C-alpha cells in the first residue's frame, strides 16, 4: 500500500518493548500502518513533564502536518493517560483520560470493582502515606499494602502489624516515591478528574492467595473480548515473577468466570476502545476468584506470546483499536503450542561483570524460532537497590520470550538461551541513594 494510504499511528511514550515487539510482527502491519514513535520515551520521561503542553504539542503537529489516524501507548504511567488525552483532543478512537485514571488509581478502581463485582473485590482501606501514625480504624492484620499508583510491584508488600506498616510508610523510599515519582500522576489527576485522594495514599487490602493470572482483553463498541489468559509462576519465597505461561492451565470454567467478572468490571469502569489487562487470582480451595488490579493498557511483554500460539501479536490488536477497527484473532494460528516469558533475576546484590552485546542477543535469538531477548543491564552496572525493582526482593536484568511444544522444553530452551547470552555477575557494594526526579 502506498505510504499516503497507510494509517498513521502514534505510539505515545514508547516503552522498551515497543520497538522490539513491533519489529517482530512487522510483516503483519507494515503495509497498512505507519508507526510514529513519540517523545519522550517511557524511560526518559521526567516527573516535571507538562501534560497539557505535551497533548497540545502533538495535537498542533498533527493538525498542521500529516495528521494522525490513531494513538496508543503500552506505557502504564504516564503514557496510557496521555495517549487517551491526545485521542480525545483529536477526536480519535480511544478511552477518555478520566476513565484511564479511574482504572489506574487503585482506590477509585476498587470502588468501581466493588460496585460491579463485589464477590471478586477484597476488602480495602486507603492509608495516607504522609501520616504514617494515623492508620484507619478496623484495618485487619496481616494485610497487603501498595501505592494507589504503582509501578510494577514497587513498594508493594505484606505487613503484619500496625507498627510494621507505620515504619514502612515512614521510610525515605516511600517519601521519595510519593513526593517525587508521583508528582506527574498528581498533575494528571488534577487535570482530568475530580478525585479527592491524590497519589500520596497507599491501599491496604485483604490478603489473597491462590493461582495468579493476567487476563488481557480489549473493549470495543461496548463489547469486551478476551485476547488471552496468562499464568504467573512465582518464586516460592520472594513471590517474584519467575515465568509467564500462555495459554493458561486453569480450568476452562474458572477462565470463563474470570472473563465474566472482567466484563462487569470494565463496564463499571467505563473503559472503551482500549486494550487492558486484569490481574486476577483463583483460590482452588474456596473457588473464589478475585481481582488484583486493572491496568488500562496492553502488556507489551506478553504481546508476542499470543503471536507464537495464536498467530496475532498484541500490537496488531492495539493498532486495530487505535484506528477504530475491531481486532480479529484465530486461536491456535501460531507455530507453537505454548509460549512463555522468562524474567531474568538476581536475588542478591551484584555487579554486572559482563552483559551481552547485540551480537550475543542475535545469536541467542537464532537458537529457536520466534525467540525474543530483551537485555536490561550493562557491563559495570550494579544491581543492588532492590527497592527500585518490582517486588523489592530481586532485580530483573532481562527477559526471554520463547515458544515451544511443552513447558519442560520451554524451560530447557530458556537455559540454553541464557547460557548463550553469557551474563556474568560478581558481588557488589551496598546500594547508593536513589533519585526519583
For each of these PLM feature ranges, what is it?
Residues 120-122, 162-208, 240-241, 264-268:
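Conserved ATP-binding module of the ATP-grasp superfamily
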Residues 48, 54-65, 84, 88, ...:
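N-terminal beta-alpha lobe that positions the nucleotide/phosphoryl donor
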Residues 257-277, 296-354:
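Active-site "cap" helix and flanking loop/linker of ATP-utilizing ligase/carboxylase catalytic domains
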Residues 1-99, 128-133, 324, 346-348, ...:
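ATP-binding N-terminal substructure of ATP-dependent carboxylate-amine bond-forming enzymes
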Amino acid at each position: 500500500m502506498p505510504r499516503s494510504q497507510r494509517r498513521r499511528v502514534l505510539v505515545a511514550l514508547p516503552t522498551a518493548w515497543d520497538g522490539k515487539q513491533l519489529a517482530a510482527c512487522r510483516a503483519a502491519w507494515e503495509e497498512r500502518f505507519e508507526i510514529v514513535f513519540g517523545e519522550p520515551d517511557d524511560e526518559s520521561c521526567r516527573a516535571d513533564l507538562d501534560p497539557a503542553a505535551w497533548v497540545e504539542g502533538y495535537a498542533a503537529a498533527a493538525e498542521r502536518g500529516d495528521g494522525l489516524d490513531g494513538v496508543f501507548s503500552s506505557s502504564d504511567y504516564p503514557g496510557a493517560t496521555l495517549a487517551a488525552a491526545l485521542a480525545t483532543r483529536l477526536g480519535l478512537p480511544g478511552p477518555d483520560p478520566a476513565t484511564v485514571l479511574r482504572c489506574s488509581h487503585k482506590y477509585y478502581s476498587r470502588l468501581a470493582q466493588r460496585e460491579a463485582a463485589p464477590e471478586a473485590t477484597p476488602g480495602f482501606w486507603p492509608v495516607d502515606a504522609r501520616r504514617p501514625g494515623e492508620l484507619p480504624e478496623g484495618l485487619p492484620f496481616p494485610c497487603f499494602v501498595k501505592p494507589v499508583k504503582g509501578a510494577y510491584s514497587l513498594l508493594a508488600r505484606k505487613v503484619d502489624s500496625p507498627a510494621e506498616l507505620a515504619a514502612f510508610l515512614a521510610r525515605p523510599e516511600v517519601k521519595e516515591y510519593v513526593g517525587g515519582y508521583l508528582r506527574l500522576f498528581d498533575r494528571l489527576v488534577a487535570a482530568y478528574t475530580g478525585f479527592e485522594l491524590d497519589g500520596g495514599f497507599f491501599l491496604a487490602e485483604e490478603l489473597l492467595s491462590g493461582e495468579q493470572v493476567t487476563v488481557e482483553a480489549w473493549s470495543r463498541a461496548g463489547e469486551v473480548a478476551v485476547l488471552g489468559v496468562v499464568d504467573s509462576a512465582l518464586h516460592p519465597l520472594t513471590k517474584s515473577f519467575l515465568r509467564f505461561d500462555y495459554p493458561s492451565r486453569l480450568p476452562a470454567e474458572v477462565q470463563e468466570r474470570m472473563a465474566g467478572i472482567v466484563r462487569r468490571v470494565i463496564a463499571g469502569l467505563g473503559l472503551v476502545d482500549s486494550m487492558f489487562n486484569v490481574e486476577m487470582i483463583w483460590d482452588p480451595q474456596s473457588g473464589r476468584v478475585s481481582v488484583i488490579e486493572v491496568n488500562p493498557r496492553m502488556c507489551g511483554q506478553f504481546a508476542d506470546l499470543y503471536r507464537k500460539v495464536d498467530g496475532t501479536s498484541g500490537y496488531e490488536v492495539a493498532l486495530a483499536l487505535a484506528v477504530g477497527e475491531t481486532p480479529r484473532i484465530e486461536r491456535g494460528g501460531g507455530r507453537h503450542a505454548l509460549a512463555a516469558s522468562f524474567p531474568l533475576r538476581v536475588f542478591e546484590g551484584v555487579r554486572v561483570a559482563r552483559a551481552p552485546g547485540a551480537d550475543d542477543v542475535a545469536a541467542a535469538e537464532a537458537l529457536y524460532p520466534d525467540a525474543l531477548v530483551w537485555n536490561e543491564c550493562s557491563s559495570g552496572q550494579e544491581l543492588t537497590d532492590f527497592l527500585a525493582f518490582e517486588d523489592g526482593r530481586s532485580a530483573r536484568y532481562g527477559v526471554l520470550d520463547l515458544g515451544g511444544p511443552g513447558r519442560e522444553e520451554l524451560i530447557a530452551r530458556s537455559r540454553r538461551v541464557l547460557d548463550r547470552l553469557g551474563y556474568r555477575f560478581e558481588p557488589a557494594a551496598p546500594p547508593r541513594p536513589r533519585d526519583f526526579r
